[in-house]
Amino acid sequence: MEKTDIITLMQLPDVGSKTVLKLYNHVSNRRLINLDFNDYISLIEEITNKKFMGIHIDKSKLKAEKLLEQCYLNKIKIFSFLDDDYPDRLKKIGNDKPVILFSKGNHDIMKTGYNLAFIGSRKVSKENYKIGVKFSKLAVDMGVNIVSGLAIGCDTAGHRGALLTNKNLLSGKTLAVLPSGIQNIYPKKNTTLSNEILEEEGCLISEKPPFESPEKYDYIMRDRLQAALSESIFILQSSLGSGTVHTAKFGEKYSKKIFCYGINTQNKGMELNKKLINEGKAFDINSEEQFKLAISKERDEHYEISH
């Protein structure tokens, strides 16, 4: 199955990653070979009990051509789940993996090094924001990559701290997982931050085509990628109503170690931190030194296993 076929199929009405994965499994299980695009259309119709008119197919081809051109002009790489260089971290999440992923910048962050998801609520206290920037810089200075979602609040603290690194050869980078297309940064307020990430050899990724706006469900999909692309997760500050809850759940599902900032968990906005620590689902971090020791230990163990 060629990448262009996958992209074109996904431009058809109501055809997404799950349908394409069903198609791929169907083809693999039957050991079907030498199929062309029209064969894939017929098989999708068989799988979904839908009939696509000629106009739908023609439109999907035009949309795919436009999408490929947009990516070429904006230096965006398209990963297919069948590519040899598709990130192993995403292969490991099985049917949760993106079928198509758009990436701009330093793609290697998805594939190498030790990644820490640095997350939390959009509403963050001034004190915790400063602590977040400091912790993130500490991690990157230790060669750890910071993965976050480019939202305001805790995400911004994570990215900003990463950009303050001493910039030696061993320094980590930062990767932003977007709920929107790479050329349509959301929130707009962080457009400058996204440019700085690229300038400092970081990376922007998204499942959305370059110029698309985010839908409600895209935020949850973004949260799963943050968890999948990281070896462990650090929650700076989060309420129980924050999207961070989704990332924590995906972290549990993917067997990721979770750390929570544990100071003043009785304060408003720290409810998720308190809950995860009390339930034994997260390790509490109460100081810079403790953060440094915990993350360096995780990093070293990761490299021992991978080598």
Predicted regions mapped to residue ranges:
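Short, positively charged patches
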Residues: 1-129
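Glycine-biased, small-residue-rich flexible motifs in mid-sequence functional cores and linkers
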Residues: 81-307
